[in-house]
Amino acid sequence: AEELVAEGKIGKVKQTMGTGPHRQGNYERPKWFYERESYGGIITDIGSHQIHQFLVFTNSNEANITHALVENTTKKQFPGFQDFGEINLTGNGGHGYIRLDWFTPDALPTWGDGRLFILGDKGFIEIRKYTDLAKSDTGNHLYYANNEEVKHIDCSDVKLPYFRNLINDVLNRTESACSQELTYLTMELAIKA
């Protein structure tokens, strides 16, 4: 997706919409999992990843949270637990909406149906990260449409440089995977939300 955006396939990015659904599971979780003071809440725990994607794809180095909400609807016996969250952001490169939840149904063959939608002024991209619902149990599906074409790309064999670069950054004290400024801004926004 980064390559397609950089090539201008969808024009200037206007908005991202990211989802971070997870499965609670039918097994015993450690006590800290339900204590906000320990895990930080659903927005810092899960939403930080979608905030990072928003900043990267909108090319924003400044952003504000315009709306944030968290709820606990399924585990009232654990008042610190949050099973739903949403965030609206406005950055100096675009807008974003993020939805997070612990509601993945048991029948889904993976732990969540994570998606990322990137809207540009000349097209859009949809990434189906972990499953292609009712079509394929595998993830890494990218769809895009612009004024010239509509395309599906199976990205399951695409090598992603991020983790290799991250390891290199740790070993060599470099910032090739992600700058410290971007990491700090991501977490600042997650904490503020």
Describe each PLM feature range.
Residues V13, T66, R128, H152, ...:
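Short, hydrophobic secondary-structure boundary micro-motifs
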Residues I153-R164:
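Active-site loop of classical SDR/Rossmann-like NAD(P)-dependent oxidoreductases
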Residues I46-H49, V158, C178-L185:
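A generic structural signal for residues located within well-ordered alpha-helices
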Residues H52-L133, F163-T174, I191:
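Contiguous beta-strand/loop segments that form the cofactor/metal-binding neighborhood of enzyme cores
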Residues E149-V150, L166-A193:
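C-terminal helix-rich "cap/oligomerization" subdomain common to oxidoreductases
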Residues L116, D132-N147:
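Short polybasic amphipathic segments
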